[in-house]
């Protein structure tokens, strides 16, 4: 049974399972500058607003981000979004972003950074109305190679 719910510190075991599973591209995860401890720290932040998708209690997808509220206006920064390969192209990432949108009636903008060579992700974001707003030169280091990041945003 597929369920979507807010992530908590209690889900750290699920992240450990996901990272050691064959479905998770651990090298890409590390190249993005993330580790399990950073995820746990994110889940404990006051600004954390993150969701996970579970299949029979196993984490198969997640969105990590910060919700920033400034005078009744909200902005959300997607820090990391991931879907296990076997669950891709099933609308799960879109459902996660929709959940962020529906839970925040004052939301004015969602923004993120994506590696310029991650064409699949860029197509996905464009399809759901994200627009390129900037380029950050040499932002990511993937397999020892510097990659530009596209900053993208969706405004409401």
Label every model-predicted segment.
Residues 84-98, 115-123, 127-128:
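Conserved glycine-rich acetyl-CoA-binding loop
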Residues 6-88, 94-99, 103, 155:
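Acetyl-CoA-dependent GNAT
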Residues 115-119, 138-156:
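C-terminal "cap" of GNAT-fold acetyltransferases
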Residues 126-136:
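Conserved acetyl-CoA-binding loop of GNAT-fold acetyltransferases
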Residues 97, 104-114:
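Conserved GNAT acetyl-CoA-binding A-motif
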Residues 2-3:
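Extreme N-terminal starter segment of soluble prokaryotic enzymes
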